[in-house]
A protein has these predicted regions:
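Glycine-rich ATP-binding loops of the HATPase_c
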Residues: 2-10
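Non-catalytic signal-transmission and effector/linker regions of two-component phosphorelay proteins
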Residues: 18, 23-44, 57, 72-74
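Two-component/phosphorelay signaling modules centered on CheY-like receiver
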Residues: 50-69
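Acidic, metal-coordinating helix/loop segments flanking the phosphotransfer/catalytic sites
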Residues: 68-87
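Short amphipathic alpha-helix used as the core "switch/output" element in two-component signaling
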Residues: 97-116, 134
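C-terminal output helix
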Residues: 129-130, 144-152
Length: 152
């Protein structure tokens, strides 16, 4: 149940307002061309840290008409199947002491199985160039590091 504007509209604009996607081939608009008819989409933020969820909700509340959050990735599939989601921000690490990003990559693969066109932005505090490349090669739309800069 993905919002049709994702797959049918081919105009190129940033996905998340201030969180600009660098992969131009996957920039999918969430708003109509007319500023008077702005249609904001729905974002799903998945992170085990409640502080990160709250911070991203505050940061993105003016960019999206609806913000859904999940504190565990096992909620993703159910949410995607029952709600129209336009973009996902997905943490890469959920288990204590593990910071290799494999959990996030696993869930990215699961998302791609049921929603191949859904933009997924990977989020991690343990990022490096190698992990970013790995995420993008696994079809992530973009890669963000924690902490992020709200001004950009």
């Amino acid at each position: 149940m993905i919002n049709k504007s994702i797959t049918e509209n081919n105009k190129k604009r940033p996905i998340i307002g201030r969180l600009i996607c660098r992969n131009n081939q996957k920039q999918i608009p969430l708003a109509s061309e007319s500023k008077n008819e702005m249609e904001k989409g729905t974002i799903l933020i998945v992170d085990d840290n409640k502080g990160v969820l709250a911070s991203l909700e505050l940061l993105l509340e003016t960019e999206f008409s609806e913000i859904k959050t999940a504190h565990h990735p096992n909620q993703i599939i159910s949410i995607i199947n029952t709600s129209p989601i336009d973009v996902i921000i997905l943490d890469m690490n959920f288990s204590a002491g593990i910071n290799n990003g494999n959990e996030g990559l696993y869930w990215l693969k699961r998302i791609r199985e049921i929603a191949p066109a859904l933009p997924v932005v990977m989020l991690t505090a343990y990022g490096d160039v190698e992990l970013a490349v790995k995420a993008l090669k696994n079809d992530a739309t973009d890669f963000l590091l924690k902490p992020w800069d709200n001004r950009t």
